[in-house]
């Protein structure tokens, strides 16, 4: 009854109006699962391959018909007949079928769509929520959200190099309250921006993209919004985080962090050592709890030096640096680079490998932050993954745009369903920092 009888993929659109995949898996019993695949704007060079058609006459070359065909004609044939509950065997079969180290033959987008749909079909077959199926009876921790309320870098036209300015309601008693705090700060920020005559249009991830005078202007404005909403900045209230996305403005030839790429003439050009000094300056000045991709993805010496300098005080998250890959994470753990990993399911391509990366991080005392991509869909699987793994943190955008809110609303449902068992750890989510 739990045997897979059909697998079907179609091309749909993501939140940026670009094509992506939706995959459906059916079983003998009638149980059904559907998975949709996200897509990134700033991508790590070591990420698994997102297969695009390259036909410029269709969707500007971004079509996904090849990946759709790979699901319908190759993957389907290979996994029909499997028990839908055998997630690892199915994921491993797809990895073997692809046969490349970066899923470049079938496409990580094709493989991931199937992987998610299989898990959802299994949960449907067993008549349990997805987070329960994935995590078992010990599932209980609601993640502390990183809310990206200001977008810069590659996610907007704002003249700021850092890609994301985030708030984290670390002092909230529950996820529901934390979400409310974030929404109220978001609206307070909008009022402040309007009063300054700044644009309140939102970027890819639902955050504002105003023409600030620089990084510190952005942080100061967020602090004013926190105060205006009636909250305090700090461990008992709301803390701040950055995604620097440094690889986006790192000049490989000159080996410098060239802020002029986004901030224009007269902006800073920093060496690796100066970049670390600058980040430390910001940490000393503001209530910052997390910094993602503070150094370029290939600047291993810089990462180690940054971790040595700030690793006990601030969460240092590797995104482009680790690309949700256990091979890179293992090296980071061994060399003392970063203290946290960003988990993006489409960077690696299967749920099995995603869970392995989270497990490896936790065993090494690293935190794991489950994350969306800038090109998202209404699929809320990452909310279930965050709870299933008790990851403790989620990064899924701002407090606007349905593609972001879908994940927050799913977490509200899960918190309700868990009832008294639910835990929201807030500041305790940063278990590897010395407070």
From Swiss-Prot:
Its cofactor is Mg(2+). Pfam families: Enolase_C, Enolase_N. It catalyses: (2R)-2-phosphoglycerate = phosphoenolpyruvate + H2O. Binds a second Mg(2+) ion via substrate during catalysis. (2R)-2-phosphoglycerate binds at residues 163, 344, 373-374, 395. The lineage of its organism: Bacteria, Bacillati, Bacillota, Bacilli, Lactobacillales. Belongs to the enolase family. CDD domains: enolase. NCBIfam families: eno. Pathway: Carbohydrate degradation; glycolysis; pyruvate from D-glyceraldehyde 3-phosphate: step 4/5. One of its GO terms (biological process) is glycolytic process. One of its GO terms (cellular component) is peptidoglycan-based cell wall. The keyword Iron does not apply. Its EC number is 4.2.1.11. Mg(2+) binds at residues 243, 292, 319. Transmembrane segments: none annotated. The active site is at residues 205, 344. It comes from the Bacteria. GO terms for molecular function: magnesium ion binding; phosphopyruvate hydratase activity. SMART domains: Enolase_C, Enolase_N. Keywords: Cytoplasm, Glycolysis, Lyase, Magnesium, Metal-binding, Secreted. It comes from Streptococcus equi subsp. zooepidemicus (strain MGCS10565). It is found in: Cytoplasm; Secreted; Cell surface. This is Enolase. Catalyzes the reversible conversion of 2-phosphoglycerate (2-PG) into phosphoenolpyruvate (PEP). It is essential for the degradation of carbohydrates via glycolysis.
């Amino acid at each position: 009854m739990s045997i897979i009888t059909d697998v079907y993929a179609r091309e749909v659109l993501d939140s940026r109006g670009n094509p992506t995949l939706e995959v459906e898996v059916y079983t003998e019993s009638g149980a059904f699962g559907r998975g949709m695949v996200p897509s990134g704007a700033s991508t790590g060079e070591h990420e698994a391959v997102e297969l695009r058609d390259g036909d410029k006459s269709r969707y500007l070359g971004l079509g996904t018909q090849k990946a759709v065909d790979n699901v319908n004609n190759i993957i389907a044939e290979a996994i029909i007949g499997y028990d839908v509950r055998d997630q690892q065997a199915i994921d491993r079969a797809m990895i073997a079928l692809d046969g490349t180290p970066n899923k470049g033959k079938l496409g990580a987008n094709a493989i991931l769509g199937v992987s998610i749909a299989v898990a959802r079909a299994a949960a449907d077959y067993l008549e349990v929520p997805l987070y329960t199926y994935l995590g078992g009876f010990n599932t209980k921790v609601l993640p502390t959200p990183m809310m990206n309320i200001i977008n810069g870098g590659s996610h907007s036209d704002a003249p700021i190099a850092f890609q994301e300015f985030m708030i984290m309601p670390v002092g909230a008693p529950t996820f529901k309250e934390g979400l409310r705090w974030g929404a109220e700060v978001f609206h307070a920020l909008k009022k402040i921006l309007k009063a300054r005559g700044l644009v309140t249009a939102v970027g890819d991830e639902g955050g504002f993209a105003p023409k600030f005078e620089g990084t510190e202007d952005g942080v100061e404005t967020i602090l004013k919004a926190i105060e205006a909403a009636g909250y305090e900045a700090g461990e008992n209230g709301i803390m701040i985080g950055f995604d620097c996305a440094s690889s986006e403005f790192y000049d490989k030839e000159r080996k410098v962090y060239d802020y002029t790429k986004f901030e224009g003439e007269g902006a800073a050009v920093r060496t690796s050592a100066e970049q670390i000094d600058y980040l430390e300056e910001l940490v000393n000045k503001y209530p910052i709890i997390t910094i993602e991709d503070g150094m370029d993805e290939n600047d291993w010496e810089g990462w180690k030096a940054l971790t040595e300098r700030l690793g006990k005080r601030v969460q240092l998250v590797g995104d482009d640096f680790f690309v949700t890959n256990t091979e890179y994470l293992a090296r980071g753990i061994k060399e003392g680079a970063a203290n946290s990993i960003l988990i993006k399911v489409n960077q690696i391509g299967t749920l099995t490998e995603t869970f392995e990366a989270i497990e490896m991080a936790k065993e090494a005392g690293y935190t794991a932050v489950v994350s969306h991509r800038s090109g998202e869909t209404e699929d809320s699987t990452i909310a279930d993954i965050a709870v299933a793994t008790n990851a403790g943190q989620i990064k899924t955008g701002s407090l606007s745009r349905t593609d972001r809110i879908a994940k927050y609303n799913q977490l509200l449902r899960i918190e309700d369903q868990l009832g008294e068992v639910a835990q929201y750890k807030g500041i305790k989510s940063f278990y590897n920092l010395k407070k």
